[in-house]
Amino acid sequence: MGEDTDTRKINHSFLRDHSYVTEADIISTVEFNHTGELLATGDKGGRVVIFQREPESKNAPHSQGEYDVYSTFQSHEPEFDYLKSLEIEEKINKIKWLPQQNAAHSLLSTNDKTIKLWKITERDKRPEGYNLKDEEGKLKDLSTVTSLQVPVLKPMDLMVEVSPRRIFANGHTYHINSISVNSDCETYMSADDLRINLWHLAVTDRSFNIVDIKPANMEDLTEVITASEFHPHHCNLFVYSSSKGSLRLCDMRAAALCDKHSKLFEEPEDPSNRSFFSEIISSVSDVKFSHSGRYMLTRDYLTVKVWDLNMEARPIETYQVHDYLRSKLCSLYENDCIFDKFECAWNGSDSVIMTGAYNNFFRMFDRNTKRDVTLEASRESSKPRAVLKPRRVCVGGKRRRDDISVDSLDFTKKILHTAWHPAENIIAIAATNNLYIFQDKVNSDVH
């Protein structure tokens, strides 16, 4: 598949760059809410930053799609497990928004062990004119109260309040790698290396174990759970991926403990490509249902694959993300990069998929035209409202002027976390400790 150098379809203009300095500020998750008006990021310091989309202004047409900081709060603190003598990092592993049901917004955030439910509310009015209290809230001297008055609401500067509503703890022995909210809007699941639990959003003291792959003897362990997600429309269906590259679709109507999957999606290994690294690079790092619910998107180290729920034998589409790294797997193993967990994302119409790579590159694949493009998210190449130019990695041979050699790639600059606006061509890219937001100015609607 050749790279598409036609920039008309991928004319993403850079909107905003929020740069930070320390290790704690490295972004560890990015998530749009269901309308795309809010964007949440979590970092290694346990903080959650919420950005809100600016309303479109007639005076400033370029402001459409820009996001400003809406609220920042500390979600998790570092803890210590005294029974196991283990430190529990404050790093936010995942954020998931709940569908909005009233004026408030709600989201779930999790670190390795504890999931928290947060409520985000706005206040732009305050009551004034109490009979028994003064403006500072102190009780008045009753002898000075000579008349009754009706308290009134007076406008005030907008205040965003974030409050913890629930804390879901003690549900996991191993590190939580994913959470997913069910379409019934009442339950969600959380997955660690060996188990998946089902929680009710209103109940914090118990959860139901729906998948348990822990063997009686841990020496017999051959695979771990890497990601899981509920089906977007059928509340009884969910999928989980494994370190062996397989996907298991489970139906909660079949049994309380879904140890027996309904469908197993697995691609037979090509014996000619077998190597020491085969199992490592086949491990699925992310799985996402399409918005339609018909397909699943998975990411392993070198590829992204699209699976049809009706065909278990093999993926219907396979896209090479950075196949030029296949010859460098040995050095990538030595520096631990081979264990990096890249995420993937669908656009709103399920026609384009996106995933990250090294050197601050990210890749887009158009499923209809079969075109693909490599773009770069970096402070050097991205200035506000500039058009992103396609990049090309060269493996030996002739090089064009803007090509970059595979030997020049910076493996410390990696894009692991990406998100796509649910209805528009706006994408959020986390590049280490910088957040980039790009918008397609040519095609403002999802094609």
UniProtKB/Swiss-Prot annotation:
WD repeats lie at residues 22-61, 87-128, 171-209, 220-260, 279-317, 334-375, 410-446. InterPro entries: PP2A_PR55, PP2A_PR55_CS, WD40/YVTN_repeat-like_dom_sf, WD40_repeat_dom_sf, WD40_rpt. Gene3D superfamilies: YVTN repeat-like/Quinoprotein amine dehydrogenase. One of its GO terms (molecular function) is protein phosphatase regulator activity. Highly expressed in brain. It comes from the Eukaryota. Keywords: Repeat, WD repeat. One of its GO terms (cellular component) is protein phosphatase type 2A complex. The B regulatory subunit might modulate substrate selectivity and catalytic activity, and might also direct the localization of the catalytic enzyme to a particular subcellular compartment. Belongs to the phosphatase 2A regulatory subunit B family. PP2A consists of a common heterodimeric core enzyme, composed of a 36 kDa catalytic subunit (subunit C) and a 65 kDa constant regulatory subunit (PR65 or subunit A), that associates with a variety of regulatory subunits. Proteins that associate with the core dimer include three families of regulatory subunits B (the R2/B/PR55/B55, R3/B''/PR72/PR130/PR59 and R5/B'/B56 families), the 48 kDa variable regulatory subunit, viral proteins, and cell signaling molecules. Interacts with IER5. This is Serine/threonine-protein phosphatase 2A 55 kDa regulatory subunit B gamma isoform. The lineage of its organism: Eukaryota, Metazoa, Chordata, Craniata, Vertebrata.
